[in-house]
Amino acid sequence: MRFNEQADGVIILDQTLLPGKEAYLTLTTAEEIWDAIYKLKVRGAPAIGVAAAYGIYVCARRIDTAEKSVFVNEFRKIKEYLAGSRPTAVNLVAALNRMERVLVAHPTLSVPEWKELLYKEAIAIREEDAAACRQIGENCLELLRPGMGILTHCNAGHLAVSEYGTALAPIYLGQERGYGFKVFADETRPLLQGARLTAYELSRAGVDVTLICDNMASVVMRKGWVHAVVVGCDRVAANGDVANKIGTSGVAILARHYKIPFYVLGPTSTIDGSCPDGDSIVIEERNPDEVTEMWYSRRMAPKDVKVYNPAFDITPHELITAIITEKGIFYKNNR
């Protein structure tokens, strides 16, 4: 993901087409950016934050006024619009708020000067995310041993962030250092991020990865093939509860049963200190067609059947062995 000045837009890889096709999109309007985030053309909490930062800068460039009050008013309208694209991932709103603070912190500057600072802030958000992800990987690698079997859910690799990933960062670093991890990737229904994205990027990197259906996690754990679970996070509440892709809490319950450490990896930007617990996190519900029709040549459920399709679930803090950020490893007793 990057800003292209010549195209005056944000360049993203359309993840909805992977692994069959690699297609890059140029996003130049608020509507295109909103659509890309909502339809998961760009996804992963950190990546959404970076996309929002670049996106609101692109939109701000197009606000054609020298009047600062008019500029701020239009900027805030765009900010609120983009913030509604995905309600669960805290990085989205955090990045947009950070971009707005550029204006608030420099009230005496002109509109062109504001625009220049917005560009620099968007770049800083991306660079900080990349550095954080690598450090997350280094911190987690301290807990892993060469040859371990590692299970992951959804996609928290370089497709979900600026570089390396969060949950996949230690796997990539381990691959560079000859650790020989054996990774089990849950397919992650209903949108198959594990099958389409995690298996895709790990196999391209030469990692030993085995794809399994979500309901097979218990089997590979029982066989002793899994020694650790690593997942990303979209929001961490103040008490340590975690919102992540639907199915994560089930994996955590299985890991607890089989006495396998369950690690949540994410940058500190995903921690929402204003959110007391998981029950306070708004869970996005998505189109029923994602369950009944997507990926199938024909509908696979009765036409009139009701569908419940939450995009995320809450993993209680008591099921989490440690939360690993760029700042360090945090266990239950030192939250």
Swiss-Prot record:
The record marks 154 as: Transition state stabilizer. Pathway: Amino-acid biosynthesis; L-methionine biosynthesis via salvage pathway; L-methionine from S-methyl-5-thio-alpha-D-ribose 1-phosphate: step 1/6. The keyword RNA-binding does not apply. Pfam families: IF-2B (PF01008). It comes from the Bacteria. GO terms for biological process: L-methionine salvage from methylthioadenosine. It catalyses: 5-(methylsulfanyl)-alpha-D-ribose 1-phosphate = 5-(methylsulfanyl)-D-ribulose 1-phosphate. Its EC number is 5.3.1.23. Keywords: Amino-acid biosynthesis, Isomerase, Methionine biosynthesis. It is an enzyme of class 5 (isomerase). The active site is at 234 (proton donor). Substrate binds at residues 43-45, 86, 193, 244-245. InterPro entries: IF-2B-related, IF-M1Pi, IF_2B-like_C, Initiation_fac_2B_a/b/d, M1Pi_N, NagB/RpiA_transferase-like. Gene3D superfamilies: translation initiation factor eif-2b, domain 1 (1.20.120.420), Translation initiation factor eif-2b, domain 2 (3.40.50.10470). GO terms for molecular function: S-methyl-5-thioribose-1-phosphate isomerase activity. The keyword Amino-acid biosynthesis applies. SUPFAM superfamilies: NagB/RpiA/CoA transferase-like. HAMAP family: Salvage_MtnA. Belongs to the eIF-2B alpha/beta/delta subunits family. MtnA subfamily. Catalyzes the interconversion of methylthioribose-1-phosphate (MTR-1-P) into methylthioribulose-1-phosphate (MTRu-1-P). This is Methylthioribose-1-phosphate isomerase. The lineage of its organism: Bacteria, Pseudomonadati, Bacteroidota, Bacteroidia, Bacteroidales. The gene is mtnA.
